[in-house]
Amino acid sequence: MDLFSSLPDEVLCHILSFLTTKEAALASVVSKRWRNQFALVPNLDIDEEGKREREEILLSFMDFVDNVLALQADSPIKKFSLKCKTGVHPRRLDAWARLGPVLPMLKTLIIDSAWIRCDTIETFLPTFPVLEELSMSINEWPDWDETVTSASLRKLSIFTIGCENFSNPKSISFDIPSLVYFEYYDMVAEDYPKVNLTSVVEARISLLLDQDQIKRGRAPNNDEDDVLLRLRNGWKLMSGIRNVQKLYISLDTLQVLSLCCKSMPVFNNLKLLSVKTAENEGWEGMPVLLRNCPHLETLVFEGLRHFVTNKCGDACDYVSREDKGRSLVSCPVKKLQIKGFRGTIRELEMIKHFLYSFRCLEKVEIYAEEKGRTRTDLEVPGMFELIARMLRLYNEFYSCDVQFLVRSSLDKKWTAQ
C-alpha cells in the first residue's frame, strides 16, 4: 500500500471511482486518507446481491448502507443507485430515500426496492435541488392524492412492482416542466388533475388494466359502466405530453385511450409512434390515435398479434366494414417497422392492408422473430420460402421498399435466396 499512499489525492480518488462501492468501501478501511478519498467518490452504486439466508446477512447489508451514507455527509455525490429487495424494513428505506439535505449535489438517483411507497416521492424529491434523473422501482401509490413536483428533473422513470395486484390509484399529478424523458409503468389512475410535462420529447407509457376492466371495455353499450367511467381521465395524462416527439405505448394504454376517444389530444410534434401488441388485447384505440398524429413519420409495431373485436376500428384488416383503412389513409407515415414477425397468414394480410392503406408509405422493415420457446411458421419446412416470395411480390406491386430482415438461425437461409 506504500506505493499507493504516495499518489496524489486526485489519483487515489480516480482509482476508487473504478471500483464497485463495496470494493471502494473495503479499500477505505486501509487508512484515514483512503477513507477520506472514498467520501469524495462521485458515484455510489449499492446492490443487495446474492442470497440472504440468514437475518444477520440482511442486518449487515443495512449497516453497510448506513455506514457508507454516513461517510458522504459533505460529499459531492452526483449519482446514487440503491437496489434492494424484500426484507429491508420500510423505515430504513424511507430514511435512505430522504437523503436530499446530505446530498445537495446529487444529479442521478436510482432506487430499486419492493417496499418503497410512491408517497415517499412527494416528500423527498423537493430536497434534491439539482436532481436531473430519477428512476424508481417501487411498491405502490397510496389511495390519497399525490403530486410529483420538480423544477430540475429532466429524466423520470417510475415502475410500480406487482401493481397488477393493486387497485387503481385515486389521483396522481405531475408538475415537472423541464422533463424531457418520461417512463411510466402503473395501473391507470382514476384522475390526473395536473400534468405539466410540456417539455417531454420521449415518453414510454404503460397504463395497466386488470382482466375485468379489459372485459368491460370490450362489452357492448358500456358507456355508462361505472368502472370504466373512472378510467376515462387517462386522456389528461396523454394531453400533458402532447408535445412529445417519440411515443412508446403498450396495448393496455391503447385500450385506455379507446375509453376517451372524444378527448384524445392532437400530437402535432409526434414523429415516431411505437405500439407493443399482444394476442389477448385489442386495437380499439388505434384509429383515433393515428388520426391525431398529423405529422407522424415512423410507425413501429412490436408484433402484429392482437385480439380482434368489433371495436378494433378501421385500422384492423380482420373486421369487415365500409370505412376499413380510413384512419390509415389519412396518416402521413412514411416508414413502417414490424418486429417479431412470425410468418402467419394473418400477419401477411395485415401487412398487405398497411401497404394498400398507408398512401405516403416509402419503406417497410419486417423483422423476423428471434427463435424462442415456441416454433414460428418461419421454421415450418417450405413456409420461409413462400413468405419470402410473397414479400417480394409486395415489394414489386406497391410503390415502397419492403425489406425482410432476419437474424440468427434464419440468417443463412435468407442469405442463400
UniProtKB/Swiss-Prot annotation:
Residues 1-53 form the F-box domain. Pfam families: F-box. Disulfide bonds: none annotated. SUPFAM superfamilies: F-box domain, RNI-like. This is Putative F-box protein At3g58950. It comes from Arabidopsis thaliana (Mouse-ear cress).
